Amino acid sequence: SRIKVEPARGSGHAWGTEMKGDVSLLRTRIGASGMDYKGYNIATHEFGHNVEQTITTEMVDYFPLYGVPNTAFTEALAFIFQKRDLTLLGLQEKNPLKEHMMALDNAWACYEIMGVSLVDVNVWKWLYNHPHASAGELKEAVLSIAREIWNRYYADVFGSKDEPILAIYSHMIENPLYLSAYPIGHLIDFQIEQYLSGKDFAAEIMRIYSQGRLIPQLWMQGAVGSPLSAEPTLKAAEQALQVVK
C-alpha cells in the first residue's frame, strides 16, 4: 500500500509523499469511542487526496511533471471520493432525485465557499497594503472584510446582515490564497462526474490524474474533452430546479 493511516489531532488532512516508493499519510479524527461518521466522511475526502498523490507521483510518465496543475484539481478528486463514502460501506442511494440533488448541492457548495475565497483574496490585498500590521489589526480587518463580503453577496439570501461567519477559516493565514481552490475544485469535480457517468471509474481516474502538472485548461481538455467552466454546474442546477420542489 502507498497510503498509511494515522490519527489526527485536528479534523484530518492528507500529506503526500515527494518521492516514488514512499507512502502518503491519511490522518483523520478517531475519538476515544472509535471513529464516528464525521471522522469517516473526512477520511474518505482525505483518501481522495491520497489517491491523487499516489497516482501523480508514481504514474506520471515524466517525473518533473508529477502532481496536479494546482490545488483545485486535488480537491476535485477528494470531493469525488467523499461523495462515495456510503457506497464504500455497501449502502446504495436509491433516491430518484439523487442526480438533481447532487447538482443543487454542488452549486450551493460553490456559492458558500466562494464567500470565504473572496475574504481570503481581500485579506491578502489588505496585508500587502499594511505590511506592518499587528495581529490585532489583522483580526479586525478579517472580520470587517468578512462582514463586507457577507453583506454584498449573502445578506439578501439569508436575511441577516453583518455576519462574520466567512472569517472562520484559518487557512487564509496559514496557507495564503488556498481557499479559492475549493470552489474551482467543485466545478472540476462536477465536470469529471458528468464525464465518468457510465464509464469505468478506476480506469478513468488513473488516466485523468496520470496526466501530471499540465496547465489547467490543457489538463481539463485531456481529462473530459472540454475546458473548465461554471456552465455545466449552472445548467444542471437550473434543470434541477425544474424538478426538485
Residue ranges and their predicted role:
Residues 26-57, 78-79:
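Active-site recognition of the HExxH zinc-binding catalytic motif
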Residues 13-14, 30-42, 64-73, 102, ...:
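Alpha-helix capping and helix-loop boundary segments enriched in small/acidic/polar residues
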Residues 21-26, 54-62, 93-100, 119-128, ...:
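Short acidic (Asp/Glu) and glycine-rich catalytic loops that position anionic groups and cofactors
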Residues 127, 131-245:
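C-terminal, non-catalytic "cap/extension" segments appended to globular domains
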Residues 55-106, 185, 225:
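Post-HExxH zinc-binding segment in Zn-dependent metallohydrolases
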Residues 1-22:
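Auxiliary, metal-adjacent structural segments of Zn-dependent hydrolase domains
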Residues 2-9, 69, 73, 98-101, ...:
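A glycine-rich phosphate-binding loop feature that marks nucleotide/adenosyl-phosphate handling sites
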Residues 83, 96-128, 145-152, 171:
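N-terminal maturation segment of proteins
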